[in-house]
């Protein structure tokens, strides 16, 4: 999980808790889901946290949560946004692979080294998490005073404008960060360490994403910014731009940054994003609304709460809430833009629980006393396994994943053939390996693969397995039906149908079931040496001597007899 470094003194100052000791602060942070991992060489706290709360990737976000926890703040405080003075114009030449952009201006900052480090850390942590290592969203932070914009928007309104467009890889030059030479974008990918790291994100594009002002190219997203607009401790006004593959993602990343800089006293100024056919005003700091029922909150947490208490707890979580008492008691909950983790009413219930204090919840024994025990199926499985071992079989546990070649081709079957009552195998959409493309529909092919891999060992080899098999069944909620299958093989120079049947009948006797073996045909077995397994009048499997074609496919030089049947056929 992500680890964030936080200056404890900075955290105390922002959260207005200067009197808190380190131990008290660590306990309060743990209550927020932030676990203390240690201290850096500079004395900063290293905090690990669940990656759902991305607004806590910076000291400003953590301090905000502590202020709510201590009651210093309540409800939602949306930073004021001044009217747009700048426009990002999106040109038609922008690569289709990265078509979206957003931005904001932040003025009046007074960044020292600690604050600048916090901003850089927030940028990089957002890249690593929500931005999917810059693939889904990348952030550029620039010194606004170094930009020169001009022109007007497509709607005719005057504006200082920069342009997001495509650039030829060997086209315009700029000086990238941490460099002193002008380079084309292609040269950046070849010669700059950051270009080598993130070059794969634009690999194969005819035109690379680029951002221009009136002076020229100053940003090559998602790879690197130009040195002309580099931010340092003397910078007071920032221009923030984000590009990506999804508008919602980069807008939410921008909201998290704007809230963090607003906590530093920054004044947010909107930016118009001109797509030609539409113009967006960003940042989008508007709230969203979700509804949660009072009954759901009480049932999930196991506590009785008054409606006013729930509203109070939600406001202490940084949310706004209004109770609706008409009919079932529900709450209309407003969620700030930086809370990208609130996707479902369950997330709101979690906030109520944390504000209430999970340590305050009192465990209670259930009204109905129950005694745990093993499932009957598990008991049966163990009993059959012990019986197989007693009959001389070696117990195996094979992979449930296999390939259609192993299931069908090497067993002399076509996909339409019936292998022990199996249905069509469940297939893997994007298999990691061609050896594991389907879930097995019967277990005998797995045992033959083991025999194939052990031809160098002495015979006899008597192997058995009780394992899961599956088939497509559209009547099931998952479209897949699973059951446990019992399979065994006898491999030796004198292996025969009679050897396998004797073991099968011994299993039937041990469990008090009537097993009959009427003759049948099966492509995997020798004609006339194959039978169906019928248990208490119900077809359950197959038994026989494996066909020479199957033995040759598996490089086996001794006869093999085998059987397979459904485990649940032995149940009472």
Swiss-Prot record:
Its cofactor is Mg(2+). InterPro entries: aa-tRNA-synth_II/BPL/LPL, B3/B4_tRNA-bd, DNA-bd_dom_put_sf, Phe-tRNA-ligase_IIc_bsu, Phe-tRNA-synth_IIc_bsu_arc_euk, Phe-tRNA_synthase-like_B3/B4, Phe_tRNA_ligase_beta2_arc, PheRS_beta_core. One of its GO terms (molecular function) is ATP binding. Mg(2+) binds at residues 341, 347, 350-351. The keyword Metal-binding applies. The keyword Nucleotide-binding applies. Keywords: Aminoacyl-tRNA synthetase, ATP-binding, Cytoplasm, Ligase, Magnesium, Metal-binding, Nucleotide-binding, Protein biosynthesis. GO terms for cellular component: phenylalanine-tRNA ligase complex. Pfam families: B5, tRNA_synthFbeta. Its EC number is 6.1.1.20. It catalyses: tRNA(Phe) + L-phenylalanine + ATP = L-phenylalanyl-tRNA(Phe) + AMP + diphosphate + H(+). Residues 285-363 form the B5 domain. It is found in: Cytoplasm. SUPFAM superfamilies: Class II aaRS and biotin synthetases (SSF55681), Putative DNA-binding domain (SSF46955). Tetramer of two alpha and two beta subunits. This is Phenylalanine--tRNA ligase beta subunit. The lineage of its organism: Archaea, Methanobacteriati, Methanobacteriota, Stenosarchaea group, Halobacteria. The gene is pheT.
């Amino acid at each position: 999980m992500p680890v964030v470094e936080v200056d404890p003194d900075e955290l105390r100052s922002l959260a207005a808790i200067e009197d808190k000791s380190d131990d008290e602060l660590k306990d309060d942070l743990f209550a927020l889901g932030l676990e203390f991992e240690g201290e850096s060489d500079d004395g900063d706290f290293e905090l690990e946290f669940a990656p759902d709360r991305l607004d806590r990737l910076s000291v400003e976000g953590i301090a905000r949560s502590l202020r709510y926890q201590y009651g210093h703040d309540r409800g939602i405080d949306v930073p004021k946004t001044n009217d747009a003075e700048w426009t990002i114009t999106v040109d038609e030449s922008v690569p289709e692979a990265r078509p979206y952009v957003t931005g904001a201006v932040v003025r009046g900052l007074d960044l020292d080294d600690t604050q600048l480090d916090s901003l850089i850390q927030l940028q990089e942590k957002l890249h690593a998490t929500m931005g999917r290592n810059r693939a889904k969203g990348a952030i550029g932070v620039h010194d606004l005073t170094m930009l020169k914009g001009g022109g007007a928007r497509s709607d005719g309104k005057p504006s200082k404008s920069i342009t997001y467009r495509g650039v030829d890889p060997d086209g315009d030059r700029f000086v990238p960060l941490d460099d002193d030479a002008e380079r084309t974008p292609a040269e950046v990918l070849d010669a700059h360490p950051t270009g080598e790291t993130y070059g794969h994100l634009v690999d194969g594009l005819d035109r690379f994403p680029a951002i221009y002002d009136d002076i020229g190219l100053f940003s090559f997203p998602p790879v690197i910014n130009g040195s002309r607009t580099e931010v340092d401790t003397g910078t007071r006004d920032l221009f923030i731009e984000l590009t990506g593959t999804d508008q919602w993602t980069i807008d939410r990343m921008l909201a998290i940054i704007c809230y963090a800089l607003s906590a530093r006293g920054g004044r947010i100024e909107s930016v118009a994003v001109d797509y030609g056919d539409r113009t967006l005003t960003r940042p989008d700091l508007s709230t969203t609304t979700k509804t949660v029922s009072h009954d759901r909150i009480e049932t999930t947490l196991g506590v009785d709460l008054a409606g006013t208490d729930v509203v109070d707890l939600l406001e202490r979580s940084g949310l706004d809430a209004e109770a609706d008492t008409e009919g079932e008691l529900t709450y209309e909950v407003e969620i700030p833009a930086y809370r990208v983790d609130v996707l479902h009413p369950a997330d709101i219930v979690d906030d109520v629980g944390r504000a209430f204090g999970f340590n305050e919840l009192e465990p209670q024994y259930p009204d109905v006393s129950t005694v745990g025990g093993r499932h009957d199926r598990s008991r049966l499985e163990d009993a059959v396994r012990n019986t197989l071992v007693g009959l001389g079989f070696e117990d195996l546990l094979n992979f449930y994943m296999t390939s259609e070649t192993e299931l069908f081709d090497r067993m002399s079957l076509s996909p339409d053939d019936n292998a022990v009552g199996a249905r069509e195998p469940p297939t893997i959409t994007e298999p990691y390996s061609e050896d594991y493309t389907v879930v097995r529909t019967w277990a005998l092919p797995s045992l033959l693969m083991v025999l194939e891999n052990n031809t160098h060992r002495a015979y006899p080899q008597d192997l058995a397995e009780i394992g899961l098999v599956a088939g497509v069944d559209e009547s099931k909620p998952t479209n897949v039906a699973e059951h446990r299958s019992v399979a065994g093989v006898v491999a030796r120079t004198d292996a025969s149908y009679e050897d396998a049947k004797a073991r099968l009948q011994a299993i039937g006797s041990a469990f008090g079931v009537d097993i009959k073996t009427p003759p049948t045909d099966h492509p995997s077995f020798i004609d006339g040496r194959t039978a169906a397994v019928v248990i208490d009048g119900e077809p359950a499997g197959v038994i026989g001597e494996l066909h020479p074609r199957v033995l040759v496919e598996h490089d086996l030089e001794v006869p093999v007899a085998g059987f397979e049947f459904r485990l649940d056929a032995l149940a009472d």
